[in-house]
Each structure stands twice: as structure tokens, then as C-alpha cells.
UniProtKB/Swiss-Prot annotation:
Its EC number is 2.1.1.-. Transmembrane segments: none annotated. Belongs to the class I-like SAM-binding methyltransferase superfamily. Cation-independent O-methyltransferase family. It comes from Serratia sp. (strain ATCC 39006). Disruption phenotype: Cells lacking this gene show an orange phenotype and produce norprodigiosin. This is S-adenosyl-L-methionine-dependent methyl transferase PigF.
Length: 348
């Protein structure tokens, strides 16, 4: 692939577009155009912002394609409302707030992260605690994080439900489930599978409330556990899933997590990790490669890996029949089974 100088300029200036859209979402600008078209003066009054700067923002959003304009009135196309209006299920404002609060400041220190091969939490937040300890100290930040992950997971969940037969299992435990989107989808498609979610204590209350709001409070149980410490309430669950989480940790910590899950699993159980791995030759894809840099600036050694690297860790942790399973959608499944009892280890 050959890129031009203009391609480079466009990529270097890409944050202009990002900040424009995030600002509009933060102001809930699109909410005011859901039911009727409005002119710049009306929008400025509703946003409680000066007319000149409001019009500058509206012009930019029109130029980017999010708004249309006719006879001086700005219009929000119907097909954009699902992800731009704040009370819609797929609203992207959760992601926008997370980017503004955490990711954008951290990425401002990418050069230092590369030079020193370490996260930039101390520089940005004045706090050397873990990424998740910083994130979970504010309930609003937890909500933003879990909500946008739930939105991100939708295409993966559709593919997982379509291509994997959950009916072969009696009980399914989803570790780190966000807003519970995957277990909810399994509940809707497989009435005979017992369902539970394992979450950190800091997020379990949020998740229980979310499940009750959606009508799944009785159908899906919420358990508390920790993959790092090994305090995992896996019990007799014969299918365990860890979604888009291994990459948050350094390879040596990933191995600890995998061993803890393996030790807690019942014999005959199956474990699946879903990730967006690098290509086998580590040439991309672009999103995963950039996500790996996001792990660099924010986490303690988190990194994206190739399928073979994930499989190697599965084998080291003790899993049998470790393999890659391709499904529809953006993620890949890394699958392994437990076929023998632990040597001297105790079950949860």
C-alpha cells in the first residue's frame, strides 16, 4: 500500500474530526434536531452557547456529513439518529466521554510511552494506580466505560450467537460482561442454558441494576470474582467466556489469568477468549495495531497479540485442544478445554 503526503496530512489532522463530533455529543446537540429542523440562532439558544461558535460547530458537522441544511435550517437525517441522539440505545456519547476523560489525554503522551515502554497514567492523572482502579473510582466513568463496550460488542455478539451452538452447554459464565449484552443475547436464543456473569465487586451493583432494568434480573445471576487473584466462582459452569480482556494485560499476566481460569474450571469445561488479534505476520489490521498503542499508554504492559501467541499461552496454562475459531463479526475466538483434574489444586 502506497500513501500520499495528503493521506499523511489527513491522518495527522484526524483529531479535528474526533473532537468536533465528541463536542457535539457532549453538548447533546443532535437531541435538539431529533424532532424538528432548526436554524443556527435557535440551536445556539438551545445549546446556551454564543451564536458565532455554535454556527461554526454546525457548519463543521454539516461538512462532515452528520447534518444536512436546507433553507437555513439544519436537519438530522433519520439514519443518524440511532447513534447520535442521547436516548437511543446505540448512542455514542458514552464513548465520547470516555475518550475525552481518559484516552485523549493519555494519547497526548504517546511519544513518552514509546520512549520508555510504559503507561502514562502518572503523567496524565497524577496517579500510579492500575488503569481499572482509576477508572472505577468514579461511578459515572464506570457507566461510560461499560455502556460503550456494550455498544462495541454488538457486531461480535451477533456473530457469536449466529455461529456458535450454546445448546451443547448446560451453564454459561461470562467474565467481565460489560452491560451483560452477551448473556442477554444467549438468554433470548437459548432458554435451557443457565446464565451468570462474573464481575469485579466495583461494578457488580451497576450490572445488577442494569439487568433488572432490562428484565433479566432473575434470569442472569451476577457473581463477584477476580481473574488476577484467582477468586473465581466458576463452579460447574461448563462454558466460560472472557471477552476482549486479555489484551488489557501483559503476556505474563495473561498467563496468570488463563491458569486461574483453568484451575477453577470443571473437568470437561470449555473456555473461550474473544479478541481482535493481530495478523499472523503482525502486519495489522490497523485497528488492532492502534489499539495496542492504546494499551501501551494506559495499561501495565497490555498488548495485542497474534493468534499463535494466544494459543501458546493457552497451552502453557494447561488447556487441551487449544484452537482458533473464526466467527462472523470483528472478533476471533481462542478456544480450549480442560480434560484432566488439577494436580494438587483446589476447585472453586
Amino acid at each position: 500500500m502506497t500513501l500520499t503526503k495528503q493521506d499523511a496530512v489527513n491522518q495527522m489532522m484526524g483529531f479535528f474530526q474526533s473532537k468536533t463530533l465528541i463536542t457535539a455529543l457532549s453538548l447533546k446537540l443532535f437531541d435538539h434536531l431529533r424532532d424538528q429542523d432548526r436554524n443556527a440562532k435557535q440551536m445556539a439558544a438551545l445549546l446556551n452557547c454564543p451564536l458565532r461558535s455554535s454556527e461554526q460547530l454546525l457548519i463543521a458537522l454539516q461538512a462532515m456529513g452528520y447534518l444536512e441544511k436546507q433553507d437555513g435550517l439544519y436537519h438530522l437525517p433519520q439514519e443518524h439518529r440511532a447513534f447520535l441522539v442521547s436516548d437511543e440505545p446505540q448512542w455514542l456519547g458514552w464513548l465520547g466521554r470516555h475518550i475525552d476523560t481518559f484516552l485523549y489525554p493519555l494519547w497526548g503522551e504517546l511519544k513518552a510511552a514509546v520512549e520508555n515502554d510504559t503507561h502514562q497514567r502518572q503523567t496524565v492523572f497524577g496517579d500510579d494506580r492500575s488503569w481499572f482502579d482509576i477508572l472505577y473510582q468514579n461511578p459515572d466513568d464506570v457507566t461510560d466505560f461499560q455502556e460503550f463496550l456494550g455498544k462495541f460488542a454488538a457486531p461480535f455478539i451477533d456473530g457469536f450467537i449466529q455461529d456458535y451452538d450454546f445448546s451443547q452447554h448446560q451453564a454459561f459464565l461470562d467474565i467481565g460482561s460489560g452491560i451483560g449484552s452477551l448473556p442477554i443475547a444467549v438468554a433470548n436464543a437459548y432458554s435451557g442454558v443457565n446464565l451468570a456473569i462474573c464481575e469485579l465487586p466495583q461494578t457488580s451493583t451497576f450490572l445488577r441494576d442494569k439487568l433488572v432494568q432490562q428484565g433479566y434480573g432473575q434470569r442472569i445471576q451476577v457473581l463477584e470474582g477476580d481473574v488476577i487473584s484467582g477468586d473465581l466462582p466458576i463452579g460447574d459452569y461448563d462454558l466460560i467466556h472472557l471477552g476482549w480482556m486479555l489484551h488489557d494485560y501483559a503476556p505474563e499476566t495473561q498467563l496468570i489469568i488463563l491458569k486461574n481460569i483453568y484451575d477453577a474450571m470443571p473437568v470437561g469445561g470449555r473456555f473461550i477468549a474473544s479478541e481482535t488479534p493481530l495478523n499472523a505476520d503482525k502486519s495489522g489490521p490497523e485497528f488492532t495495531a492502534l489499539l495496542s498503542l492504546n494499551m501501551l499508554v494506559s495499561t501495565d504492559g497490555g498488548i495485542e497479540s497474534s493468534p499463535q501467541e494466544y494459543l501458546s499461552r493457552f497451552h502453557q496454562a494447561g488447556f487441551s485442544n487449544a484452537r482458533i475459531m473464526d466467527i462472523s463479526g470483528p472478533r476471533t475466538l481462542i478456544v480450549g478445554e480442560k480434560t484432566t483434574h488439577n494436580n494438587g489444586s483446589s476447585q472453586c
